[in-house]
Amino acid sequence: MQYSTLAGQTDNSLVSNNFGFLRLPLNFMPYESHADWVITGVPYDMAVSGRSGARFGPEAIRRASVNLAWEHRRFPWTFDVRERLNIIDCGDLVFSFGDSRDFVEKMEAHAGKLLSSGKRCLSLGGDHFITLPLLRAHARYFGKLALIHFDAHTDTYDNGSEYDHGTMFYTAPKEGLIDPSRSVQIGIRTEHSKKLPFTVLSAPKVNEDSVEETVRKIKETVGNMPVYLTFDIDCLDPSFAPGTGTPVCGGLSSDRALKILRGLTDLDIVGMDVVEVAPSYDQSDITALAGATIALEMLYLQGAKKD
């Protein structure tokens, strides 16, 4: 197999980084590996409507994850996820920068190849548009999906743009990728259309309700469908995550978001991503740390199924 470099874009997909997520060994042959979960960095931010810079999110998340690597039995879990799951980091997706169509093709192909070889995908963005080609690959493999979506925005806007990080969840139901009536959006605190039957749990409501009540509503909505889990870091209040392109005050605390995530252990989560970390706007790497922690907690959700 031939590997790409940033200087010489080829048809093959991955470029190395200096280190992997959680100090995991880098593996540039993910399709042939025995991994359960494959982490891919997705340095794409050409679909943003506000501040750019999320293309540097994967690097920042990996760097922050080094601070999490030492804790073998992560609190409050009772196990080391690295002993339950075979997790690899395959580096960053390579595509022709400036060419969104090429990005979409490469993202779908990479995820589809991983899924067809028995792996699951955890993707580190990048802006939130990366979720659309990932949903296409997952729906092709698993069928129609339920979506669990943490965000300040519903991303259901119909503005006619083919590449926009605010339109994916308008497009995905139209393409039959997700069932909006079995999907839930958590942390919303911006104006949005109510034409689609998503269950919307606004940030004020989530902050007022108990964690247990929020988890109950999520589980009640998605049922036993295969679930795609996506976490836009701007779901968190800017006091916890300032380093993002479109921050909105009044969001969730990192504590509440993590507790909600930990309640989702018995759902059939088949794909996951963390998006919209833009380190140039960060303070003391707290947004990158939040992104790394959320990504790690997502993996612990999967490890908990091995009990």
Curated annotation (Swiss-Prot):
Per its UniProt record, what InterPro entries does this chain match? Agmatinase, Agmatinase-rel, Ureohydrolase, Ureohydrolase_dom_sf, Ureohydrolase_Mn_BS
Q: What is any one GO biological process for this UniProt entry?
A: spermidine biosynthetic process
Q: Which terms in the Gene Ontology molecular function aspect does this entry carry?
A: agmatinase activity; manganese ion binding
Q: Its annotated pathway?
A: Amine and polyamine biosynthesis; putrescine biosynthesis via agmatine pathway; putrescine from agmatine: step 1/1
User: Required cofactors, per record?
Assistant: Mn(2+)
Under Enzyme Commission nomenclature, its number is: 3.5.3.11
Question: Per the record's keyword annotation, is Hydrolase included, yes or no?
Answer: yes
Encoding gene (name): speB
| Residues engaged in binding Mn(2+) | H128, D151, H153, D155, D232, D234
Catalyzed reactions per annotation:
agmatine + H2O = urea + putrescine
Q: Which protein are we looking at? A: Agmatinase
In UniProt terms, what function does this protein have?
Catalyzes the formation of putrescine from agmatine.
Which major enzyme category is it?
A: hydrolase
Family of the protein in this entry: Belongs to the arginase family. Agmatinase subfamily.
Highest taxon in the source lineage: Bacteria
Pfam families per UniProt: Arginase (PF00491)
* Keyword tags: Hydrolase, Manganese, Metal-binding, Polyamine biosynthesis, Putrescine biosynthesis, Spermidine biosynthesis
